[in-house]
Amino acid sequence: MTSTSARPARRSRAPLAITAAIIAALVIAFFIFAGFYADVLWYDQLGYLGVLLTQWGAGIALFFIGFLAMAIPVFVSIQVAYRSRPVYAKLNSQLDRYQQVIEPLRRLAMFAIPAVFGLFAGVSASSGWQRTLLWLNRTPSGTTDPQFGLDTSFYLFELPFYHAVVGFASAVVIISMLGVLATSYLYGAVRFTGREVRISKSSRIQIAITAGVYFLLQGVSIWLDQYSSVVNTANGGLFTGAAFSDVNAVIPGRTILAGIAVVVAVMFIITAAIGRWRLPIIGTAGLIVASILIGTAYPAIVQRFQVEPNERSLESPFYERNIEATRAAYGLADIEEIPYDATTDTTPGALREDAATTANIRILDPAVVGDAFSQLQQFRQYYQFGDNLDVDRYQIDGRVQDTVVAVRELSPTNTGTSWVNQHLVYTHGYSLVAAYGTQRTSDGQPVFLESGIPASGDLGDFEPRVYFGEDSPDYSIVGGPESGDKVELDYPSGVDGADETYTTFQGDGGPKVDNVFKRLIYALKFQSEQIFLANQINDQSQILYDRDPAERVGKVAPYLTVDKDPYPSVVDGRVVWIVDGYTTSDQYPYSQQTQPLVPTDRINYIRNSVKATVDAYDGKVTLYAWDTDDPILKTWQKVFPSTLKPIADISGELMSHLRFPADMFKVQRAVLGKYHVTDPGSIYSNQDLWTTPNDPTATTEAGTPASLQPPYYLTMQMPGQDSPRFSLYSTFIPPATQDTSRSVLTGYLGVDSDAGSTAGEKAADYGKLRLLTLPNDDTIPAPTQIQNNFNSDTNVANQLNLLERGGRTSVVRGNLLTLPVGGGLLYVQPVYVRSTGDTSYPLLRKVLVAFGDKIAFEDTLDAALDSIFEGDSGATAGDEDVVPTTPADGAAGDGSTDGATDGGTGSTPTPAPTASPAAPAQDVQAALDAANTALQERQAAYASGDLVAAAQADQRFTEAVQRAYELSQQQ
């Protein structure tokens, strides 16, 4: 009775379980669909839907090709083996039991096994969509490899594809063979009887043909390997490419082995017909022996007994190939080498011919002044500036000025915790801030040429709102009718910034969320029910996400390696992020492989092929084909037509802000450390290696170097140039060994980074590399040695101790710049002082200069240059008009903002009275009078609504009060 009643209960639960499973599957499917559909909306809004569909189309097509190419042969192999099984096979008891277990599942297994392998094969094949599209759209490069005389496009586009196809086909044959053997064994077509193996005729034919196909594929693979020798490392990794033993032993050997493999394949086909296994077994053994003798032993013998005794002379032609290919692949072929016999003598007027360079020496360090930008220009806690700012240039009053720039972005951690605040109210940053790189105020602050809220300065009118930046919120929902309520916080306004201005996004920056379905899609994508439920979202709302400039470029141009350091510029009335994109390969014949960009990737070819811009207001991405000779870029232009614009479409203003990328330069300097010489003997012996010095200003807690010295942007005139150009430079020193470590300069590398300002035409010398080579017997100190000289100089040490005020302030050393001027090498390092308070910021108080073995430590760069060149350098610096304030006891001006204002403008404040050893009462009164005047000016500025003037007056008021307090303490 009990068992009878239980059966209906179990039956009644079955439909419920099935229904639940179906619902769960539908929910999961909809989640997956939501992700795909959100991608479609994002790409479609940006105008790059074709990129996504091409990726998906190629991936899906390759998936089905891979699935069918694996599943069909495996299925056919198993089916043929099963259908040709012996009818009355003699099976042992164990096989009989296996059959009893398998037989009920046989039909399912015969379909499931090929399908499972097909799925894995499809996924693997789809991941090679880039390789396949490159092969289908391959473009000749016009250059040939020196060994086989093939166009380098064969190695860049064809050889990787052929290897992948042969490897995939080999995997298909192996899995098919395993299926044949397993089926034949289970059903008695292959039997082990003692020492004998009995194979039925049908199985023999199938196994032999399958083996023949496999060896035929191995012959093709071995044949292709001879071409791979010119892109593989040789001589124990000393260089990339085919060396003497490769050319004279390995390549001929592989040709022979490929022929033997084909012969073995024919032997297996013959066996399928005649039924004798002896012949292919002997052939297989012969192939193995030949592989050992011809493929391994013979090249080793040639290397050991022919090459090593005469290695330098025999390998010399192949090192020449390696040198030529490496310099071509990394853009070093046209480098101009200039011998530079640097002097260390200082004479009056030595810099007169370099006056244009000294006037452009940047004393503002973008890696240090981030906190100064924050304290002087942040204004509100919900804004922030990055730690490392960027270097750009603008034409001010007819003169191009190097500047340090940053975007005032939102600080996501200070926008409140409510969903409305984080995603509807705090949606964007505000404006670009720029400071002169060559100037400072009298108290060491940056001199801003564009600053404040609302933005004002020398850059003219531009759209200041920054919806897309490096620190933008993960997503924001913006937009609405012009007549509706404005909910997006724009910027602080009113007296003391007590009021706030609101705005509504009016651009086309993200997918519309104008219906319930799209809101549901994005609620699932971002796992936030508020997107679906919020009443503030209307039919004109847009959702902005994936807002990082580098990320946006990487998504619309998936074939690029994207520079991770975009920089902002004001271009044609908009703030835009400029992003560099690189095409790379590891298949350039004979070019040396390196790991410069990503530690896990090896490359031996790189081009800065694309310049991209991302509009900071609406996120629009524009790609420009920059290196029109790059065959990889040409190929991708065929894959994604109409996604890249020609150089002719670049405006003159945008062109003036494009620069040679630092990441590309780092790759080139790393390669040039070895390949600055063109003599094969020097490359072979590694006798003249160079390396980049460590950054003397970046150390770990243990005092050891933390990183290599970065390249620096400067406007300067190098030897070989007829006028100063915006440049990027780096220095070289000998590498340290176990016995020696010489901190002397061996080379100075500079590249012309100025693209010009002509619309649609880059400057003729853009990207021109110049290498100053110093004589080996010169002992020009390198940056690390100069830093040691600064630190050990008694006068410098005493003044630094005064600046540190017994621990109440700290000294921050800025970037140590090296300039080839005055017939030698000039070192310049700004010195900043900041208090130990949480709200302090660095002030530029001193400048260190070195030339040869002489050191100067002065308040301004202009004074330091005169000091080091015996009172008259013959040139002026950008800070020549600065009259620094004199800190009391070396103490004032530490950048503390305790009780200070929201920010400053960078205009030179009225200097407060200087303290004397025993400050008289009139000095205190003068300071109080200055404070009273500044207070009245602040009140007047607020009354007129001039926030910039109010901030300036507020800063002067605070400084005067602080000065009065310090003077009163000395009485």
UniProtKB/Swiss-Prot annotation:
Membrane topology: Multi-pass membrane protein
Cellular localization per UniProt: Cell membrane
Transmembrane stretches, start-end: 16-36, 56-76, 108-128, 161-181, 205-225, 255-275, 281-301
Annotated GO CC locations: extracellular region; plasma membrane
Record's compositionally biased regions (Low complexity): 884-900, 907-921
Region spans: Disordered: 687-706, 874-924
Pfam family, one: UPF0182
Keyword NADP among record annotations: no
Biased composition (Polar residues): 687-702
Protein name according to UniProt: UPF0182 protein CMS1887
Similarity section: Belongs to the UPF0182 family.
Keywords: Cell membrane, Membrane, Transmembrane, Transmembrane helix
Coiled-coil regions listed: none
Primary location: membrane
Keyword NADP: no
